[in-house]
Amino acid sequence: MAKRIIYPLYQLGNPQLRIFRPTFNMTLVRPGKEQPPDTVQFRISMAMTKCDVRNYLEKIYSVPVSAVRTRIQYCSNKKRNHLNQRVKRPDYKVAYVQLAQQQTFQFPDIFPEKDKKSKEGSVEEMHEKFMEDERQRQKPDPRRGGVTEWFGL
């Protein structure tokens, strides 16, 4: 699973408790397109396999996994640096994990919409008042009977 496993030095005494810490990282990503509620998208290391992703989630986080699909996202090299050399962003692997047993996942709403109540004397209130005055001023005069202002007196 890991590229190179470094075991701790042997020390006298039993039992030897071994803690396995994987060198991989998985980043939970908000999907760009709408996905089923039981599918979760991760950005993973290029060295990880489908079995690694499944074991990572099931053994460490106790999340039941039904299926894992992966793809490699190749990044472009169209950007140029200050020396006019092409700069390529690193490629990454994306894993789509389908949860088992009718489980669903919904991204938490970290930044909820705040109420539109503005404070008295605030910039937003002054802007709204100005815009309302402009709308009133630009309304056609009802006494003119539909004649445009171009035919003014």
Curated annotation (Swiss-Prot):
An annotated Gene Ontology molecular function: structural constituent of ribosome
The alphabetized list of GO BP terms reads:
mitochondrial translation
State where composition is biased (Basic and acidic residues): 111-146
How is the subunit organization of this protein annotated in UniProt?
Answer: Component of the mitochondrial ribosome large subunit (39S) which comprises a 16S rRNA and about 50 distinct proteins.
- Region Disordered: start and end of each range? 110-153
Q: Which UniProt keywords apply?
A: Mitochondrion, Ribonucleoprotein, Ribosomal protein
Q: Which GO terms describe its cellular component?
A: mitochondrial large ribosomal subunit
Chief localization: mitochondrion
User: What InterPro entries is this protein classified in?
Assistant: Nucleotide-bd_a/b_plait_sf (IPR012677), Ribosomal_uL23-like (IPR013025), Ribosomal_uL23/eL15/eS24_sf (IPR012678)
Q: Which Pfam families match?
A: Ribosomal_L23
Which source organism? Danio rerio (Zebrafish)
Q: Which family does it belong to?
A: Belongs to the universal ribosomal protein uL23 family.
Q: What is this protein called?
A: Large ribosomal subunit protein uL23m
Which compartments does it reside in? Mitochondrion
